């Protein structure tokens, strides 16, 4: 998906955070 580097970095951080609890992610 297309997002600015900053937004993508935040989303990735949230994705990693969510991965610890659930196996679902925006990727």
Swiss-Prot record:
It is found in: Mitochondrion matrix. One of its GO terms (molecular function) is acyltransferase activity. GO terms for cellular component: mitochondrial matrix. Residues 17-27 have a biased composition (Polar residues). Belongs to the 2-oxoacid dehydrogenase family. Part of the inner core of the multimeric pyruvate dehydrogenase complex that is composed of about 48 DLAT and 12 PDHX molecules. This core binds multiple copies of pyruvate dehydrogenase (subunits PDH1A and PDHB, E1), dihydrolipoamide acetyltransferase (DLAT, E2) and lipoamide dehydrogenase (DLD, E3). Interacts with SIRT4. Interacts with DLD. Required for anchoring dihydrolipoamide dehydrogenase (E3) to the dihydrolipoamide transacetylase (E2) core of the pyruvate dehydrogenase complexes of eukaryotes. This specific binding is essential for a functional PDH complex. This is Pyruvate dehydrogenase protein X component, mitochondrial. It comes from Mesocricetus auratus (Golden hamster).
């Amino acid at each position: 998906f297309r997002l600015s580097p900053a937004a993508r970095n935040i989303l990735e951080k949230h994705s990693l955070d969510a991965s610890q609890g659930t196996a679902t992610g925006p990727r």
